[in-house]
Amino acid sequence: MANMRKNHPLLKIINHSFIDLPAPSNISSWWNFGSLLGMCLVLQIATGLFLAMHYTADTTTAFSSVTHICRDVNYGWVIRYLHANGASMFFACLFLHVGRGLYYGSYMYLETWNIGVILLFTTMATAFMGYVLPWGQMSFWGATVITNLLSAIPYVGTDLVEWIWGGFSVDKATLTRFFAFHFILPFIITALVIVHLLFLHETGSSNPLGIDSDADKIPFHPYYTIKDILGVVVLLAVLSGLVLFSPDLLGDPDNYMPANPLNTPPHIKPEWYFLFAYAILRSIPNKLGGVVALAMSILILLFVPFLHTSKQRSMTFRPISQCLFWILVADLITLTWIGGQPVEHPFILIGQVASVLYFAIIIILMPLAGWLENYLMKW
């Protein structure tokens, strides 16, 4: 059996990736989120496939088809809420995974990091299109507001928006194409995940100390497979609790009203995992400036490896950088809160201060902290 595992053309790849893979002996539970994200992706594709069997991508029947899934399909409500709350768990794991990468200097593996940022972008696009599909009030107005942002692009903006809409407003054509993209993108994400793992296994995992771990490696199985199973059990327990006890906790009540182009909801807001970017968008009075800031809130991650000035890779022994990192986390939580608030005083000012601080920490303060720590260590 061992021979087959090591020699069979297909099993050999799985063996080198998940069984005999040499892994650092000291990686903590923060390294669990990669496997949890893989599990979330499989769960989303599986539940999404069953939902697609009963869903109709038509403006007149989309809302009714989702209601039909919840009421008439066997365990349809479980599948629907697993999919909706599974997306929330997916993004929670994504943000923790990116945060781990920032804290422990995983961004120094350039190719892996860049593919990861592309994955984050693609996942956000997929989730946005999925939010439009139930065709509730927030689905319709969210799609209208966010796609309309592209009209801020000089010269081609208006044409681009109408091209995406497939007409002069968000309508049947928009819903149909969003469903098509929402269905195909998870498979593109799966392909990108394979590339992400390919680049990761070229270098091997980093570790909490940020030092070379070639001298002390252990096999991935059984040590980290058991550790990953614990993470999966915890994640499934939290997800089950959400789905079975408060499935609408993270949703918006407005989405239980069918889309009405003649009635604008008092507060248009996306799902919680987009609120930080939405707050940055709203904090800039100029439309084009807001769109640029929105894009940069994620794209800035691509510049992080080039802004690394410290001679140590990880933040484990860098107290000043640690303080800045946790201020950044608090700032992102503040932005998430602001994104869900109405556009009025004092929320506008808090959002603007938090947005400036977000970019200042990453672009200015982190590199300065790295230099200062080098100086204090007499390097």
UniProtKB/Swiss-Prot annotation:
One of its GO terms (cellular component) is mitochondrial inner membrane. It is found in: Mitochondrion inner membrane. A ubiquinone binds at H201. The keyword Ubl conjugation does not apply. Pfam families: Cytochrom_B_C (PF00032), Cytochrome_B (PF00033). The chain crosses the membrane at residues 33-53, 77-98, 113-133, 178-198, 226-246, 288-308, 320-340, 347-367. InterPro entries: Cyt_b/b6_C, Cyt_b/b6_C_sf, Cyt_b/b6_N, Cytb/b6-like_sf, Cytochrome_b, Cytochrome_b_C_euk/bac, Cytochrome_b_N_euk/bac, Di-haem_cyt_TM. Its cofactor is heme b. GO terms for biological process: mitochondrial electron transport, ubiquinol to cytochrome c. It comes from the Eukaryota. CDD domains: cytochrome_b_C, Cytochrome_b_N. The keyword Zinc does not apply. Binds 2 heme b groups non-covalently. Heme b b566 binds at H97, H196. It is a multi-pass membrane protein. Heme b b562 binds at H83, H182. Keywords: Electron transport, Heme, Iron, Membrane, Metal-binding, Mitochondrion, Mitochondrion inner membrane, Respiratory chain, Transmembrane, Transmembrane helix, Transport, Ubiquinone. One of its GO terms (molecular function) is ubiquinol-cytochrome-c reductase activity. Component of the ubiquinol-cytochrome c reductase complex (complex III or cytochrome b-c1 complex) that is part of the mitochondrial respiratory chain. The b-c1 complex mediates electron transfer from ubiquinol to cytochrome c. Contributes to the generation of a proton gradient across the mitochondrial membrane that is then used for ATP synthesis. The cytochrome bc1 complex contains 11 subunits: 3 respiratory subunits (MT-CYB, CYC1 and UQCRFS1), 2 core proteins (UQCRC1 and UQCRC2) and 6 low-molecular weight proteins (UQCRH/QCR6, UQCRB/QCR7, UQCRQ/QCR8, UQCR10/QCR9, UQCR11/QCR10 and a cleavage product of UQCRFS1). This cytochrome bc1 complex then forms a dimer. Heme 1 (or BL or b562) is low-potential and absorbs at about 562 nm, and heme 2 (or BH or b566) is high-potential and absorbs at about 566 nm. Belongs to the cytochrome b family. This is Cytochrome b. It comes from Tupaia belangeri.
